[in-house]
Amino acid sequence: MSTYLKFAGLGALACLVASCETPGTQATRQAATAHGRRITNVRTTAYTHTERGGRRNAVGKNLSGQGHVSAAADWSRFPLGTKFQIVGTQDRYIIDDYGGALVGTNTIDLYKTSRGAMRLWGVRRVDIDILEWGSKQMSLKVLAPRRKNGLVRRMIAGIEANKS
């Protein structure tokens, strides 16, 4: 009987502790992985080349749907060249693009090769493993000539504020 009470008490304590975690801390929870860092509860959306931006990414190359697939993000949060994998899948991506709606968010926009695949993805929250962090210096080099754009200026300010 006393063993049962101990387990019941531990279970109740675990539930209490878990319920104290707020959605904000869940969204930014990070853990070390073999490759770098796991980031949990990342909001992802999808885009494709038939949308306004066309087939080229921010560095002027074709969007990639193979190997490390193209992805867009706020470069002050995920610098140009950041490679990551969606946990539990073989899906690997590289940040080689950005989008105005992503600036100031932790959202990553995943490239899909068709509108159907883009719609099928929709909006999902996923855990990602950072395989390799991109370069803040390269991000700044690409963004500097585009400084007239207000959203680009916000990314540049974010990168410069987080240089470490």
Residue ranges and their predicted role:
Residues 1-8:
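Bacterial N-terminal signal peptides that target proteins for export
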Residues 20-164:
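Solvent-exposed, well-ordered loop and adjacent helix/strand elements within mature globular domains
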